[in-house]
Amino acid sequence: MILSKRPHLMIRKLSEMLVPRSRSAAIKPEEYTASPRSPLDLNFPSPVHSKRFGSGGVGLGIVAALEETSNGINRHDPVRYSGRFRCPEIDLSDEEYTYVTSPNGPTKVYYNDDGFELSENDYRRVHKPMVTVDEPPVIERQSVRGPTEFLSSCCLCKKKLQGKDIYMYKGEMGFCSAECRSVQIMNDERQEQCKTQVSRNADVLSSPYAAGQRLSAGVFVF
Protein backbone atom coordinates (compact mmCIF):
# COMPACT_ATOMS: atom_id res chain seq x y z
CA MET A 1 0.00 0.00 0.00
CA ILE A 2 2.85 2.37 0.78
CA LEU A 3 4.42 1.81 -2.62
CA SER A 4 1.16 2.54 -4.37
CA LYS A 5 0.67 5.93 -2.63
CA ARG A 6 4.04 7.43 -3.64
CA PRO A 7 3.34 7.65 -7.38
CA HIS A 8 0.05 9.44 -6.64
CA LEU A 9 1.82 11.96 -4.39
CA MET A 10 4.41 12.68 -7.06
CA ILE A 11 1.73 13.19 -9.70
CA ARG A 12 -0.19 15.56 -7.38
CA LYS A 13 2.94 17.66 -6.68
CA LEU A 14 3.78 17.89 -10.36
CA SER A 15 0.23 19.00 -11.16
CA GLU A 16 0.37 21.67 -8.45
CA MET A 17 3.69 22.99 -9.83
CA LEU A 18 2.38 23.20 -13.38
CA VAL A 19 -1.11 24.58 -12.59
CA PRO A 20 -1.56 27.13 -9.74
CA ARG A 21 -4.09 26.41 -7.08
CA SER A 22 -6.07 29.57 -7.80
CA ARG A 23 -6.58 28.62 -11.42
CA SER A 24 -7.22 24.99 -10.67
CA ALA A 25 -9.77 25.98 -8.08
CA ALA A 26 -11.47 28.33 -10.50
CA ILE A 27 -11.99 25.58 -13.04
CA LYS A 28 -15.04 23.53 -12.19
CA PRO A 29 -15.43 19.89 -13.09
CA GLU A 30 -18.45 20.59 -15.29
CA GLU A 31 -16.31 22.93 -17.44
CA TYR A 32 -14.13 20.08 -18.59
CA THR A 33 -15.17 18.96 -22.05
CA ALA A 34 -14.16 15.89 -23.85
CA SER A 35 -12.35 16.07 -27.15
CA PRO A 36 -14.76 16.29 -30.12
CA ARG A 37 -15.20 13.06 -31.99
CA SER A 38 -17.26 14.47 -34.92
CA PRO A 39 -17.80 17.88 -36.63
CA LEU A 40 -21.16 18.17 -34.89
CA ASP A 41 -19.44 18.17 -31.50
CA LEU A 42 -17.50 21.35 -32.35
CA ASN A 43 -19.09 24.32 -30.55
CA PHE A 44 -18.11 27.55 -32.28
CA PRO A 45 -18.44 30.66 -30.08
CA SER A 46 -21.25 33.00 -31.02
CA PRO A 47 -20.55 36.74 -31.63
CA VAL A 48 -22.48 37.64 -28.51
CA HIS A 49 -20.35 35.49 -26.25
CA SER A 50 -17.08 36.33 -28.03
CA LYS A 51 -16.61 39.46 -25.92
CA ARG A 52 -16.75 37.51 -22.66
CA PHE A 53 -13.10 37.05 -21.90
CA GLY A 54 -11.77 34.68 -19.24
CA SER A 55 -10.02 35.81 -16.10
CA GLY A 56 -6.74 34.29 -17.15
CA GLY A 57 -6.28 36.25 -20.41
CA VAL A 58 -4.39 39.42 -19.50
CA GLY A 59 -4.18 40.81 -23.04
CA LEU A 60 -7.85 40.18 -23.72
CA GLY A 61 -8.78 41.89 -20.44
CA ILE A 62 -6.86 45.02 -21.46
CA VAL A 63 -8.69 45.09 -24.80
CA ALA A 64 -12.02 44.74 -23.02
CA ALA A 65 -11.16 47.58 -20.64
CA LEU A 66 -10.22 49.83 -23.57
CA GLU A 67 -13.52 49.07 -25.29
CA GLU A 68 -15.48 49.93 -22.15
CA THR A 69 -13.73 53.29 -21.80
CA SER A 70 -14.17 54.11 -25.49
CA ASN A 71 -17.91 53.37 -25.31
CA GLY A 72 -18.38 56.15 -22.74
CA ILE A 73 -16.87 58.79 -25.07
CA ASN A 74 -19.12 60.36 -27.66
CA ARG A 75 -17.00 61.24 -30.64
CA HIS A 76 -19.71 63.38 -32.18
CA ASP A 77 -20.04 65.87 -29.33
CA PRO A 78 -19.88 69.44 -30.68
CA VAL A 79 -16.94 71.56 -29.60
CA ARG A 80 -18.10 74.43 -27.49
CA TYR A 81 -16.47 77.78 -28.25
CA SER A 82 -16.91 80.90 -26.22
CA GLY A 83 -16.03 84.15 -27.95
CA ARG A 84 -14.15 86.89 -26.18
CA PHE A 85 -16.08 89.84 -27.60
CA ARG A 86 -19.56 90.35 -26.23
CA CYS A 87 -21.62 93.18 -27.61
CA PRO A 88 -23.99 94.79 -25.08
CA GLU A 89 -27.63 94.77 -25.99
CA ILE A 90 -29.14 97.96 -27.42
CA ASP A 91 -32.84 98.57 -27.53
CA LEU A 92 -33.48 98.78 -31.25
CA SER A 93 -37.25 98.56 -31.49
CA ASP A 94 -38.44 100.17 -34.69
CA GLU A 95 -35.69 102.66 -35.58
CA GLU A 96 -33.09 102.20 -38.26
CA TYR A 97 -29.48 101.71 -37.26
CA THR A 98 -26.12 101.42 -38.98
CA TYR A 99 -22.96 99.59 -37.86
CA VAL A 100 -19.65 101.29 -38.70
CA THR A 101 -16.59 99.15 -37.93
CA SER A 102 -12.94 100.13 -38.20
CA PRO A 103 -9.96 97.72 -38.18
CA ASN A 104 -8.11 99.41 -35.30
CA GLY A 105 -10.77 101.24 -33.29
CA PRO A 106 -13.91 100.25 -31.42
CA THR A 107 -17.15 99.44 -33.10
CA LYS A 108 -19.60 102.33 -33.37
CA VAL A 109 -23.34 102.03 -33.79
CA TYR A 110 -25.27 105.05 -34.97
CA TYR A 111 -28.86 104.70 -33.84
CA ASN A 112 -31.44 107.31 -34.82
CA ASP A 113 -29.86 110.68 -33.83
CA ASP A 114 -27.51 109.37 -31.15
CA GLY A 115 -24.18 107.57 -31.36
CA PHE A 116 -23.27 104.61 -29.18
CA GLU A 117 -19.61 103.61 -28.92
CA LEU A 118 -19.03 99.95 -28.05
CA SER A 119 -15.67 99.20 -26.43
CA GLU A 120 -14.26 95.70 -26.81
CA ASN A 121 -12.07 95.81 -23.68
CA ASP A 122 -14.42 96.66 -20.81
CA TYR A 123 -17.77 95.95 -22.51
CA ARG A 124 -19.23 99.35 -21.85
CA ARG A 125 -21.51 101.63 -23.83
CA VAL A 126 -20.74 105.32 -24.16
CA HIS A 127 -23.46 107.68 -25.27
CA LYS A 128 -22.15 110.23 -27.75
CA PRO A 129 -24.28 112.76 -29.57
CA MET A 130 -23.80 112.77 -33.29
CA VAL A 131 -22.20 115.87 -34.76
CA THR A 132 -24.20 117.25 -37.63
CA VAL A 133 -22.46 119.53 -40.10
CA ASP A 134 -24.55 122.48 -41.17
CA GLU A 135 -24.53 122.79 -44.91
CA PRO A 136 -24.01 126.30 -46.28
CA PRO A 137 -27.12 127.81 -47.76
CA VAL A 138 -27.42 127.63 -51.49
CA ILE A 139 -26.79 131.03 -53.04
CA GLU A 140 -29.49 131.76 -55.51
CA ARG A 141 -28.30 133.00 -58.81
CA GLN A 142 -29.32 136.57 -59.21
CA SER A 143 -30.69 137.39 -62.58
CA VAL A 144 -30.27 140.76 -64.20
CA ARG A 145 -33.99 141.10 -64.64
CA GLY A 146 -37.05 139.64 -63.04
CA PRO A 147 -38.76 136.47 -64.27
CA THR A 148 -41.45 138.48 -66.04
CA GLU A 149 -38.89 140.54 -67.98
CA PHE A 150 -36.59 137.61 -68.82
CA LEU A 151 -36.21 137.30 -72.62
CA SER A 152 -39.02 139.76 -73.16
CA SER A 153 -36.86 142.60 -74.56
CA CYS A 154 -33.30 143.21 -75.76
CA CYS A 155 -30.87 144.03 -72.98
CA LEU A 156 -29.23 146.78 -75.07
CA CYS A 157 -31.80 148.46 -77.32
CA LYS A 158 -34.90 147.33 -75.37
CA LYS A 159 -36.70 145.98 -78.43
CA LYS A 160 -39.37 143.37 -77.94
CA LEU A 161 -38.12 139.82 -78.49
CA GLN A 162 -41.48 138.16 -78.87
CA GLY A 163 -41.57 136.19 -82.13
CA LYS A 164 -37.94 137.04 -83.04
CA ASP A 165 -34.60 135.23 -82.90
CA ILE A 166 -32.84 135.69 -79.58
CA TYR A 167 -29.06 135.90 -79.23
CA MET A 168 -27.99 134.78 -75.76
CA TYR A 169 -24.97 136.02 -73.81
CA LYS A 170 -23.76 134.54 -70.47
CA GLY A 171 -26.84 132.34 -70.36
CA GLU A 172 -29.13 135.02 -68.98
CA MET A 173 -28.92 138.01 -71.32
CA GLY A 174 -30.92 138.05 -74.56
CA PHE A 175 -30.39 140.34 -77.56
CA CYS A 176 -32.34 140.98 -80.69
CA SER A 177 -29.32 140.81 -83.02
CA ALA A 178 -25.71 139.76 -83.12
CA GLU A 179 -24.65 143.42 -83.27
CA CYS A 180 -26.29 144.23 -79.93
CA ARG A 181 -24.67 141.22 -78.38
CA SER A 182 -21.24 142.25 -79.72
CA VAL A 183 -21.65 145.75 -78.29
CA GLN A 184 -22.52 144.28 -74.89
CA ILE A 185 -19.48 142.02 -75.02
CA MET A 186 -17.22 144.98 -75.82
CA ASN A 187 -18.69 147.00 -72.97
CA ASP A 188 -18.06 144.18 -70.51
CA GLU A 189 -14.49 143.78 -71.68
CA ARG A 190 -13.89 147.53 -71.32
CA GLN A 191 -15.23 147.44 -67.77
CA GLU A 192 -12.97 144.52 -66.89
CA GLN A 193 -9.94 146.36 -68.24
CA CYS A 194 -10.82 149.45 -66.22
CA LYS A 195 -11.13 147.38 -63.05
CA THR A 196 -7.77 145.72 -63.55
CA GLN A 197 -6.09 149.07 -64.28
CA VAL A 198 -7.53 150.66 -61.15
CA SER A 199 -6.44 147.74 -58.97
CA ARG A 200 -2.96 147.84 -60.50
CA ASN A 201 -2.59 151.58 -59.80
CA ALA A 202 -3.72 151.05 -56.23
CA ASP A 203 -1.07 148.37 -55.73
CA VAL A 204 1.65 150.65 -57.10
CA LEU A 205 0.64 153.55 -54.86
CA SER A 206 0.58 151.35 -51.76
CA SER A 207 4.06 149.87 -52.36
CA PRO A 208 7.01 151.34 -50.32
CA TYR A 209 9.13 151.77 -53.44
CA ALA A 210 6.69 154.27 -54.92
CA ALA A 211 6.66 156.25 -51.64
CA GLY A 212 10.49 156.45 -51.67
CA GLN A 213 10.50 157.78 -55.19
CA ARG A 214 8.12 160.60 -54.23
CA LEU A 215 10.31 161.63 -51.32
CA SER A 216 13.54 161.59 -53.32
CA ALA A 217 12.09 163.81 -56.04
CA GLY A 218 11.91 166.86 -53.77
CA VAL A 219 14.95 169.07 -52.83
CA PHE A 220 15.08 170.44 -49.32
CA VAL A 221 17.44 173.39 -48.49
CA PHE A 222 18.06 174.38 -44.88
UniProtKB/Swiss-Prot annotation:
Gene Ontology CC terms: cytosol; nucleus
BP-aspect Gene Ontology terms: cellular response to hypoxia; response to salt
Main location group: nucleus
GO molecular function: kinase binding; zinc ion binding
Induction info: Down-regulated by NaCl.
Signal peptide limits: none
Pfam family, one: zf-FLZ
Mapped zinc finger ranges (FLZ-type): 149-192
Top-level taxon in the UniProt lineage: Eukaryota
Subcellular location as annotated: Nucleus; Cytoplasm
Keywords of this entry: Cytoplasm, Metal-binding, Nucleus, Zinc, Zinc-finger
Subunit record text: Interacts with KIN10 and KIN11 via its FLZ-type zinc finger domain. Interacts with KINB1, KINB2, KINB3 and SNF4 via its N-terminal part.
Its biological purpose: May act as an adapter to facilitate the interaction of SnRK1 complex with effector proteins, conferring tissue- and stimulus-type specific differences in the SnRK1 regulation pathway.
Entry's family note: Belongs to the FLZ family.
Protein name as annotated: FCS-Like Zinc finger 13
Species this chain originates from: Arabidopsis thaliana (Mouse-ear cress)
Annotated gene: FLZ13
